[in-house]
Curated annotation (Swiss-Prot):
Native species: Escherichia fergusonii (strain ATCC 35469 / DSM 13698 / CCUG 18766 / IAM 14443 / JCM 21226 / LMG 7866 / NBRC 102419 / NCTC 12128 / CDC 0568-73)
GO MF term (any one): zinc ion binding
First-tier enzyme category under EC: oxidoreductase
Record note on cofactor: Binds 1 divalent metal cation per subunit. Can use ions such as Zn(2+), Mg(2+) or Co(2+).
Role this protein plays: Catalyzes the NAD(P)-dependent oxidation of 4-(phosphooxy)-L-threonine (HTP) into 2-amino-3-oxo-4-(phosphooxy)butyric acid which spontaneously decarboxylates to form 3-amino-2-oxopropyl phosphate (AHAP).
Similarity annotation: Belongs to the PdxA family.
GO BP terms: pyridoxal phosphate biosynthetic process; pyridoxine biosynthetic process
Subunit structure: Homodimer.
Full protein name: 4-hydroxythreonine-4-phosphate dehydrogenase
The reaction(s) this protein catalyses: 4-(phosphooxy)-L-threonine + NAD(+) = 3-amino-2-oxopropyl phosphate + CO2 + NADH
Binding site for substrate: 136-137, 274, 283, 292
Length: 329
């Protein structure tokens, strides 16, 4: 890395395990400066509950970034709206969570931070606070005015991107259009090259229907939409294989020769990845004008403040973000 960079972290729902994980993350050295967008008392109280040392130093945007030393974090303060009891949701803190996301996103857009790592949020509390909120991905897409973003989850062994995300099954076939596939594959291909350092990405593409349509006998979306798009993109030089039946694609003879899989919908691709690497996976938002990774788990309210939360996914998310920073320099 040419110079030390700053990575901003949002712990997510304050009553959940996000603050625990951030405190655990701070117990080791990092080659980047970790700037945590959070309430100071929340972090120090949670560190005390876990019996872990934590020193907060103020964020100074005009000073050079410094590698993170064990037991310390750089704090970009955002005040809680209500006091927090670990494991107990407070509706007003939905506003606090969104404020941390907005500040972190804006800092990435203005060049303060090289990447953003997000902890788990509780969507219900945010919506109960009167803030329409579908998820991190959609929030950052709108705030950054990105034309289109793509959700990808990854482990050390597997990357799975999604053509559609949080849609009911009944709506998916209509959503798989030539325009959508062109856009999603272009973003996936571009970010695999620029953010992952893969010169010529090899992408496996799932069919939509069982047996990838069985030649049109189990649905025609492959023939009418997916195959023509893949043929057009192959002419442009992209290395695309498919459409392949999803029930046979996820095996070594295909995956050993691929850099990523494109699934047509959420529950087509993610069960395999989460079975293989739950707790070690990372959620990546492709198509944003900055690097964003996230843990692949929820708020786990029942574990908050008890010292039982597994920091593995957060560590993986941060390590991946650091690699992506290096690839983009």
């Amino acid at each position: 890395m040419v110079k030390t960079q700053r990575v901003v972290i949002t712990p997510g729902e304050p009553a959940g395990i996000g603050p625990d994980l951030v405190v655990q993350l701070a117990q080791r050295e990092w080659p980047v400066e970790l700037v945590v967008c959070a309430d100071a008392t929340l972090l120090t109280d949670r560190a005390a509950m876990l019996g872990l040392p934590l020193t907060l130093r103020p964020y100074s945007p005009n000073s050079p970034a410094q590698p993170q030393t064990a037991g310390t974090l750089t704090l970009l303060p955002v005040a809680l709206r209500e006091s927090v009891t670990a494991g107990q949701l407070a509706v007003e803190n939905g506003h606090y969570v969104v404020e941390t996301l907005a500040r972190a996103c804006d800092g990435c857009l203005n060049g303060e931070f090289a990447a953003l790592i997000t902890g788990p949020v509780h969507k219900g509390v945010i919506n109960d606070a009167g803030i329409p909120f579908t998820g991190h991905t959609e929030f950052f897409e709108e705030r950054s005015q990105a034309k289109k973003v793509v959700m990808m989850l990854a482990t050390e062994e597997l990357r799975v991107a999604l053509a559609t995300t949080h849609l009911p099954l009944r709506d998916i076939a209509d959503a798989i259009t030539p325009a959508l596939l062109h856009e999603v594959i272009a973003i996936l291909h571009h970010d695999l090259r620029t953010k992952f350092g893969i010169a010529e990405p090899r992408i496996l593409v799932c069919g939509l229907n069982p047996h990838a349509g069985e030649g049109g006998h189990m649905g025609t979306e492959e023939i009418d939409t997916i195959i023509p798009v893949l043929d057009e993109l192959r002419v442009q030089g992209m290395k695309l294989k498919g459409p392949l039946p999803a029930d046979t694609l996820f095996q070594p003879k295909y995956l050993d020769n691929a850099d990523a899989v494109l699934a047509m919908y959420h529950d087509q691709g993610l069960p395999v990845l989460k079975y293989q690497g739950f707790g070690r996976g990372v959620n990546i938002t492709l198509g944003l004008p900055f690097i964003r990774t996230s843990v692949d788990h929820g708020t786990a309210l029942e574990l908050a403040g008890r010292g039982k939360a597994d920091v593995g996914s957060f560590i993986t998310a941060l390590n991946l973000a650091i690699k992506m920073i290096v690839n983009t320099q």
